[in-house]
């Protein structure tokens, strides 16, 4: 079904399949020159991990301190005898 649907659209516009996209004015969009290929995003992911780690540690420390405070509030006070 996919090839039957796409065939009339791509055959009518251009001979090459990379030029079959049109903008709102009817001009062809050349995918090879308009967009760049993303091949390696590993370095970006590593950079984000380095930024997220200190933030995560701060959030965990804040939550731990808050939990400790809540536990102390709920503990019964020991009376001196």
From Swiss-Prot:
Interacts with cytoplasmic envelopment protein 2; this interaction is essential for the proper localization of each protein to the assembly complex and thus for the production of infectious virus. Pfam families: U71 (PF17474). Plays an important role in the cytoplasmic envelopment of tegument proteins and capsids during the assembly and egress processes. Also participates in viral entry at the fusion step probably by regulating the core fusion machinery. Signal peptide: none annotated. Keywords: Host cell membrane, Host Golgi apparatus, Host membrane, Lipoprotein, Membrane, Myristate, Palmitate, Phosphoprotein, Virion, Virion tegument. Myristoylation and palmitoylation (probably on one or more of the nearby cysteines at the N-terminus) enable membrane-binding and Golgi apparatus-specific targeting and are essential for efficient packaging. Phosphorylated. Phosphorylation does not seem to be required for recycling to the host Golgi apparatus. Packaging is selective for underphosphorylated forms. It is found in: Virion tegument; Virion membrane; Host cell membrane; Host Golgi apparatus membrane. It comes from Human herpesvirus 6B (strain Z29). GO terms for cellular component: host cell Golgi membrane; host cell plasma membrane; membrane; viral tegument; virion membrane. One of its GO terms (biological process) is viral budding from Golgi membrane. A lipid is attached at residue 2 (N-myristoyl glycine). Its main location: virion. It is a lipid-anchor. Disulfide bonds: none annotated. Belongs to the herpesviridae cytoplasmic envelopment protein 3 family. The keyword Membrane applies. It comes from the Viruses. This is Cytoplasmic envelopment protein 3.
